[in-house]
């Protein structure tokens, strides 16, 4: 628990060996790391790489706080393991609950969104970095920290929900998800996550 903040997450796997993951990691100076990632491809190999990446991140964040540097260190350490596997898309936010500031770095993952207390998107954070494991040389562009006003909502995700397809080949879409969050913005974080899950399941029907 973080004083003044309500945080929740979930994975909606396509199989029991999903490559998606999330984590909340204690970082330096009483900040918290918010991690969302996806291993390209699925299967037991992807699940093992996901576990390895999580372990690396928890080790790196003991001595590094800048999200860009953290992801660079992750690439350095896990790149040899990914040569024959694929790559990982990862977004990492560093929340300072005292300053209400969110620093962010993105290695090929879906953008993060900041919604205000009225549920309107006031910022879409795109840093445009390449996924972890594609190249040995790795660098991310910086982004300005986001200041979180009272009632703000920060949304981290992979492409799984917006690109989920139903039996009619229609995508769930990011706008549908953001609209759903806006409608339920007064609910708790865990309730919002559950509502999104229910809507995605209902939307998919007999699709994938």
Label the predicted regions.
Residues 164:
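ABC-family ATPase nucleotide-binding domain "signature/switch" substructure
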Residues 151, 175, 182-208:
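Non-catalytic regulatory/interaction regions at protein termini and inter-domain linkers
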Residues 58, 75, 178-185:
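Regular secondary-structure segments
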Residues 1-155, 198-208:
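… and, occasionally, acidic/histidine-rich disordered N-termini of signaling adaptors
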Residues 46, 50, 64-67, 170, ...:
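Short, charged, low-complexity patches
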Residues 161:
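Conserved short acidic donor-positioning loop in nucleotide-sugar-dependent glycosyltransferases
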């Amino acid at each position: 628990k973080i004083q003044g903040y309500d945080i929740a997450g979930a994975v909606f796997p396509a199989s029991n060996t999903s490559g998606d993951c999330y984590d909340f990691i204690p970082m330096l100076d009483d900040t918290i790391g918010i991690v969302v990632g996806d291993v390209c491809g699925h299967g037991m190999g992807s699940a093992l790489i996901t576990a390895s990446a999580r372990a690396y991140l928890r080790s790196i964040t003991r001595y590094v706080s800048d999200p860009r540097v953290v992801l660079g260190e992750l690439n350095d350490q896990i790149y040899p393991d990914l040569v024959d596997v694929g790559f990982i898309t990862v977004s990492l936010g560093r929340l300072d609950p005292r300053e209400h500031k969110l620093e962010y770095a993105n290695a090929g993952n879906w953008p993060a969104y900041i919604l205000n207390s009225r549920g309107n998107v006031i910022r879409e954070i795109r840093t445009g970095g390449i996924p972890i494991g594609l190249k040995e040389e790795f660098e991310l562009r910086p982004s300005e920290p986001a200041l979180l006003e009272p009632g703000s909502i920060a949304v981290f995700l992979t492409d799984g929900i917006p690109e989920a397809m139903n039996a009619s080949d229609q995508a769930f879409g990011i706008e549908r998800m953001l609209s759903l969050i806006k409608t339920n913005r007064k609910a708790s974080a865990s309730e919002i996550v559950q509502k999104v899950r229910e809507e995605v399941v209902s939307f998919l029907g007999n699709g994938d």
